[in-house]
Every structure is written in structure tokens, then in C-alpha cells.
Amino acid sequence: MVEPASPDSDEGISLLEFHGNGDRSWQLNFDDFQVSPEHKEKKSPSKLHNCLGCLGPEDNVADYYQQQVEMLEGFTEMDELAERGFVPGMSKEEQDNLAKSETLAIRISNIANMLLFAAKVYASVTSGSLAIIASTLDSLLDLLSGFILWFTAFSMQTPNPYQYPIGKKRMQPLGILVFASVMATLGLQIILESLRTMLSSHKEFNLTKEQESWVVGIMLSVTLVKLLLVLYCRSFTNEIVKAYAQDHFFDVITNIIGLIAVILANYIDYWIDPVGAIILALYTIRTWSMTVLENVNSLVGKSARPEYLQKLTYLCWNHHKAIRHIDTVRAYTFGSHYFVEVDIVLPADMPLQVAHDIGESLQEKLELLEEIERAFVHLDYEYTHKPEHARSHC
């Protein structure tokens, strides 16, 4: 039986205090289950093989051992967290510097979008190309989306614990959802306009040498700048900056397609221009529809992968030897991070102070994980009861 903590002990309880240096035979230990170097060297099947259904016996074996390696690495990570009491990572100063860098990336992207939009407006007026106009309208939406993403980032940095007690991190996927919806709507409008042009009686498309030079020069310059912004923004892990990177990459594709459509329409036939615009529109709808689905899943509370739940269960069981059972381990998305619910069973005669300290330290330990925004640890003395929440499975 666990003895209650002495009254004169410190109020702040270390995450390491419960482990001590005594007997650890009660803990799960996978140190003896190491994958041989022979199997570590086996490469998992490529995505192409997986998609085509061309997995042979060797591919399945390699995939199995890859999963085992990842599982053992995950358990090792949990052991390091339990032993050190913290997750190795950036210091407060490094985090502040990273936040400043992310803000700078957003500002650079917004300024570049304004300048490039002005250049593409001139190219659209000069060429009259539907494909270039479609690309220019996309740049206009870049400015609008930039404002949306900036607003969500600003909202997240101004907490209000009374009106928003669990924070505003849901603003991030909501902003991306609005952005994606506007982009998909633009794509549909471009398709309708392109079809109208193809069915109209006006069937000519001609550019002078001077007009062609201006259009090609502007579009190539814009594409190069956007490509540099893609590489810059992809170096960050922040979801908003990554959304900018995706948008810049999309611009690179649309600029190239628009430029090719203009040149071919000028030298071959007029219909290539509206066809190029339709291709851009379909690409827009597909890209941002996938973005919508991804962010919807993050808001509706999709469960974490079984492999991640394994890691959490392992961490919970090894937290304290007084834990008799683990009743529930849940992790589900609530924005870009996980909410975690854990039910552990402790001895019925354990003093409240000791039980509280065990549960609180487990909660703090779980919240040290980068993917977890908030953890809830529920303490119980038995596990045969019905669910506490009347609508827990609705």
C-alpha cells in the first residue's frame, strides 16, 4: 500500500518523484525486445506499390518490422519523458525567436502578394488572357486569405480566459476552412466564364511581340519569387505559415499553367487559353477541397491513431505502481492538437492527497507532449461501472 506523503513535503511535486530509484519490476519494459539490424535495414514498401496493390510477402514483412521499430522508438520516447520529467526541446528564448520568425514569414508573404498582384493585374490587362486573369484573381484571393490567416493568428495571441476558457487554437483551422472555401468558389466561377468564352462567337487571341515579352517576363518573375517563398515558408512547422507555403506552391503551378496556355493560344489556337483556365480552376477546387476535409476532421474530434494511443497507455501504466487498471485512454483532435482523456484505477483506501498527486502529475506529464493541448485524468477505485457521462457514446 502506498504511504501518504509527509505533511512537510514540498507543494511542488516533481514528475520524477513517484518513480524513485527503487524496484521497477512493476513497469512495462521493452528493452529486451530489440529489432535485429537485419530487419531494421529492410525498407518499407513505397507508396506507389501500396497504391497499386503490388505488395509481396517481403513488402509485408518489411512493413511489419518498420511498425515494430516505430513502436519501440515511441516507447523509448515515453521512457525518456518519465525519467527526465520534461520533453527535450527549445528554450523560452528559442520559442520567442521562432515566433518572431513566423511573424516575419507571414509579413513577407503578405507584402509579396500585394506587389505580385499589382504585376499580374498589368499582365492581365496587357494580354486579356483568361488563364492569366484566373491566376490574377487567385492572387487577389491570396491577399484576402492573408488577412484571414493574419486575423486568426492575432486572435490566438490575445487570450480571453473568461469568454474562451480553453483558448482560441480552433481559430487556426477555422481560418483555413474559410480560406479554402473562397478558393473553391473562385474555381467554379472561372470554369463558368471559360465555358462561356469557348461558346462565344469571338474566336481570336493575338499578342504583339511587345505584349508577349511583358507577359512572359512578369509571369516568370512572379513564379520565381513564389518558388523562393515556398522554400522559405516550408522551413516552419506552424500551420498558418505552412498554409502560406501551400498557397505559394499553388501559385507556382497556376503561373506556369497560365503562361503555357497564353503562349500556346497565341501561336496555335484561341481555345487553349480557356482550357488552361479550366485546368487551373479544377486544380484549385481539388486542392482546397482536400484542405477542407483535412481541417474538418481536426474539428470534429477524430481519434488519434492506435499507435499514438499505445504510447499514451504505456506512459500511463509506467507512471506509478499504485495504478491498478487503466480504464480509458482517449486522444482526439480539437483543432490542430489533441485533447486526451485518461481514466485510471487506484486503490480504494488510498488517501485523497496521494491519489490527487498521482493524477495531477500524470496530467502534467501528458501535457508535456507536443501534440497534446490539454489532458484530463479521471481517478476511480473500480472499473466495472457504467460510463459516467449519459451521452458519452452519442
From Swiss-Prot:
Which terms are listed as keywords in the entry? Golgi apparatus, Ion transport, Membrane, Transmembrane, Transmembrane helix, Transport
Membrane topology note: Multi-pass membrane protein
Which residue ranges does UniProt annotate as crossing the membrane? Answer: 104-124, 131-151, 173-193, 213-233, 252-272, 274-294
Q: What is its main location?
A: membrane
Q: In which tissues is it expressed?
A: Widely expressed.
One MF annotation (Gene Ontology) recorded for this entry? manganese:proton antiporter activity
Compartments where found: Prevacuolar compartment membrane; Golgi apparatus membrane
Which segments sit on the Vacuolar face? 125-130, 194-212, 273
Q: Which residues face the membrane's Cytoplasmic side?
A: 1-103, 152-172, 234-251, 295-394
UniProt-listed Pfam families: Cation_efflux, ZT_dimer
Gene Ontology CC terms: Golgi apparatus; Golgi membrane; late endosome
Entry's InterPro entries?
Cation_efflux, Cation_efflux_CTD, Cation_efflux_CTD_sf, Cation_efflux_TMD_sf, CDF_Transporter
Superkingdom of the organism of origin: Eukaryota
Give the knockout phenotype.
Increased accumulation of manganese and hypersensitivity to elevated levels of manganese.
One of the GO biological process terms:
response to copper ion
For this chain, the family text in UniProt reads: Belongs to the cation diffusion facilitator (CDF) transporter (TC 2.A.4) family. SLC30A subfamily.
The record describes the protein's role as: Cation/proton antiporter involved in endogenous manganese tolerance probably through vesicular trafficking and exocytosis.
Listed name of the protein? Metal tolerance protein 11
- In its UniProt entry, the species of origin is given as Arabidopsis thaliana
Task: Identify the taxonomic lineage of the organism of origin.
Answer: Eukaryota, Viridiplantae, Streptophyta, Embryophyta, Tracheophyta
